Amino acid sequence: MPHVTDDGRDPRRVPDNWREILDPSEWALNHEGLPSRRAARVIVLRQMPDPAVLLVVGHDFADAGRSWAFTPGGGLRPGESPVQGALRELAEETGIRLTGSDLEGPVVERSAHFAFNLVTCRQDELFYLARLDAELAARADAVRGQDGQMDRSGWTPLECDVLDSLRWWPLDELDAAVGAGMVVHPQALPALARRLLRGWDGKVLTIREEGGD
């Protein structure tokens, strides 16, 4: 067990003003003394015109030099199911509005540390799969701007500050970017995306990542 302060935090990784850094309505200290939350995400894939995955690229709010790519999603609201949260977050972050019948899974269950510059958190996530057919992919492209970016009108002020891009990443381009040093979460996403494009086998992949960005 880590040493925790009287207010329940691990002082090595969590400053006493952590509630000013994170939204305390979403995050609560867990048994490790870390801010923790439950979240839901969507791995959005398309087959045409080229196999691609929809990714957000963002940076550390205290260090713009640290960046990573990840799938749309976020923390669950009180009383919200993971499917409801995944659909809401997808709509807010991308403008893509799907229904529960458009999702498969959860396909991945992930528990991970996020070591930001100022605070380390834990997030327990469920990932759902959305394989967009030609009609759904066209609907997604309809909300894309002239710069190739997806709709960002639903982003919060904080998201506008720390999220840098939202676009389709062709899988070959993603492989090259990761090979050149880009960090992607989950780390297995490039290979996982290729496998899920061929179909989901019904098995939930469990991922535990410690000490990550």
Identify the meaning behind each predicted range:
Residues 2, 137-213:
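Nudix hydrolase/Nudix homology domain
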Residues 2-50:
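Acidic, metal-coordinating catalytic segment for phosphate/diphosphate chemistry
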Residues 37, 66, 71, 121-125:
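Short connector loops at helix/strand junctions that flank enzyme active sites
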Residues 45-53, 61-64, 77-78, 109-112, ...:
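Short, charged/polar surface micro-motifs in flexible loops or helix N-caps
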Residues 50-93, 97:
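Conserved Nudix-box catalytic region and its N-terminal flanking loop in Nudix hydrolases
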Residues 55, 127-129, 166-168:
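Conserved hydrophobic/aromatic beta-strand scaffold that supports enzyme active sites
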Residues 74, 88, 101, 169-172:
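Structural detector for helix-capping/boundary residues
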Residues 96-154:
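Active-site segment of metal-dependent pyrophosphate-handling enzymes
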